[in-house]
Amino acid sequence: MNALFIIIFMIVVGAIIGGITNVIAIRMLFHPFKPYYIFKFRVPFTPGLIPKRREEIATKIGQVIEEHLLTETLINEKLKSEQSQQAIESMIQQQLQKLTKDQLSIKQITSQIDIDLEQVLQTNGNQYIESQLNNYYTKHQNQTIASLLPNQLVTFLNQHVDNATDLLCDRARNYLSSAKGTQDINDMLDTFFNEKGKLIGMLQMFMTKESIADRIQQELIRLTSHPKARTIVTSLITNEYQTFKDKPLNELLDASQFNEIAENLSVYVTTYASKQANKPVVTLMPQFVDYLEGQLSSKLANLIIEKLSIHLSTIMKKVDLRGLIEEQINTFDLDYIEKLIIEIANKELKLIMSLGFILGGIIGFFQGLVAIFV
């Protein structure tokens, strides 16, 4: 009976010692949070293991995640997966549908990313257009007009310059035959008669003003169809056209004139662009919106994935995943880290404590046997 009591007593004592030892060991992982000193000597095991090795733990966790979990290869594979493709394409489609449904304008779209488009157009737009035009003038001012125009346009003008004669003569004939032309001829005759006085008065004794005006009108109309007159007009137009082509830009427009044109043009362009920017995109560019919804979403998704894949290595270096994780872990309160680890490994920690009681009890049992027989 005495032997049994000794064995039971040793088992209980061993279990208590083993269990409490493991509980203390687990607590010492986290506590104390700071070192304690007696005089100038630091108390052993202060701070606890995790507070003491916190930076090393953060570094190792960051290294493991970067090298084995969130690797560049793994992210690249995930990025190129069909699921990612569909997700990006779906997001683009949603934004395009919102663009159509909400009747968003270009100005509203840019305002969502904190860009005042109207202000940008009025300041940067004017300056940019004027600067580009003035730079163009400075660079090409000594070149001829023909050399500055596109080759196709020069060829077209060369082929059709003779048609200007027909156009001008037809317009002149229509004008002279009209009531306005008749009235203008009569008005000019009145002025002419008033200026010439008595000499013209003698002419009116033989012909009336109306008959003179009618005769002049008929002759002018006849001249518009006369071959020689048309040849003269053609020659004048051709000569003027050739002179115009061969003129340097600075002879046609000096710097001040060109600068004035540049200012007016920049104001016109920016004002027009500002008005268009207030119109809904779906109204302004319906075909483009249809193209976006139909084909571009898939192409844009592929382009995004392709560019991300190409620059993924650079992006990951810029992000510095390891450093980010280290920094984040080092900012956690030790209380939070303790709660987090206990929450994750709660079952395992309880098992360790239970194992301490069991092993302590087993050791106590053998100690009891030794105490009896020795």
From Swiss-Prot:
Keywords per UniProt: Cell membrane, Membrane, Transmembrane, Transmembrane helix
Transmembrane segments: 4-24, 354-374
Subcellular location: Cell membrane
Topology class, membrane: Multi-pass membrane protein
Cited InterPro entries: DUF445, UCP032178
GO cellular component, one term: plasma membrane
Pfam families reported in the protein's UniProt record: DUF445
The keyword Ribonucleoprotein appears for this protein: no
PANTHER family documented for this protein: UPF0754 MEMBRANE PROTEIN YHEB
Family the entry assigns: Belongs to the UPF0754 family.
Protein name per UniProt: UPF0754 membrane protein SAOUHSC_01978
